[in-house]
């Protein structure tokens, strides 16, 4: 019988004042992997992936601003730059350097933007399910659905 590993639920306050929630699957000292969910996701969206990776990596699954147990954005700032600053602040707060960044959908866009501005922080980048550009009609549809 296999024992299911449970992550530690933690929060970190960034210099910007926003509190971000994340799941830490342990294994300190192993290479760090930071997982970013999609628009309608949250840190637990990565539970199955995290369980598979946590034997060999320190897996951190972040609730991005406005999602899961993280704070809503101050003044409603959900810009790409704000997400990039959150990733930078989070990685600095946890002393992550040379980490692997994995992003799905919106998290993939944020990961790609982060890599473009802070590639020196990354060892690897994995992008899952993003398109080449943002179509305004898609943004309008998502806004209506939310």
Regions found by a protein language model. Give the residues of each.
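Alpha/beta-hydrolase fold catalytic core
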Residues: 1-33, 55-57, 96-97
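Glycine-rich His-Gly loop
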Residues: 35-38, 105
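Conserved catalytic-core motifs of eukaryotic protein kinase domains, centered on the activation segment
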Residues: 45-47, 70-76, 136-139
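Serine-hydrolase catalytic-loop signature spanning alpha/beta hydrolases and amidase-signature enzymes
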Residues: 38-48, 59
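Active-site loop/oxyanion-hole signature of alpha/beta-hydrolase fold enzymes
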Residues: 15-16, 23, 51-54, 61-102, ...
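Conserved hydrolase catalytic core segment
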Residues: 97-138
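Alpha/beta-hydrolase active-site loop signature
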Residues: 40, 64-68, 132
